[in-house]
Amino acid sequence: MVEYKQCIIIRDDLKLSKGKLAVQVAHAAVSAAEWASRSDLENWKEGGQKKVVLRVEKLQDLFELKEKARREGLSTALITDAGLTEIAPGTVTVLGIGPARADYIDKVTGNLKLV
């Protein structure tokens, strides 16, 4: 059976509080899933909706991952914060990729560290 998953990648340089980080990750998970193909979304749901949260050092890393994911045909969602609490308005916080086949996502995120 083919495994499906979703990855959410956070920026380590922002040093967000746990609560703020949880909200940003949730935004990315929902938004990226909305862009996924119907078949990827259904397969992911049937497989338990696996999610993996990873990290990068800085904003440029998120942009590079988004471009790599686009080239692989993966759905993505780059999340920008409204700036009402901890960080400046318009700050890009996280990137959601997938859901999609795990082997496709691993081509893009396989070298990243877990949060």
UniProtKB/Swiss-Prot annotation:
Location(s), subcellular: Cytoplasm
As recorded in UniProt, coiled-coil segments are: none
Biological-process GO terms, alphabetical: translation
According to UniProt, the reaction catalysed is: an N-acyl-L-alpha-aminoacyl-tRNA + H2O = an N-acyl-L-amino acid + a tRNA + H(+)
Cite the EC number.
3.1.1.29
GO MF entries: peptidyl-tRNA hydrolase activity
PANTHER family, sorted: PEPTIDYL-TRNA HYDROLASE 2 (PTHR12649), PEPTIDYL-TRNA HYDROLASE 2, MITOCHONDRIAL (PTHR12649:SF11)
The protein's role, per its UniProt record: The natural substrate for this enzyme may be peptidyl-tRNAs which drop off the ribosome during protein synthesis.
Cross-referenced HAMAP family, in alphabetical order?
Pept_tRNA_hydro_arch
UniProt protein name: Peptidyl-tRNA hydrolase
- Organism of this sequence: Methanococcoides burtonii (strain DSM 6242 / NBRC 107633 / OCM 468 / ACE-M)
The beginning of the lineage is:
Archaea, Methanobacteriati, Methanobacteriota, Stenosarchaea group, Methanomicrobia
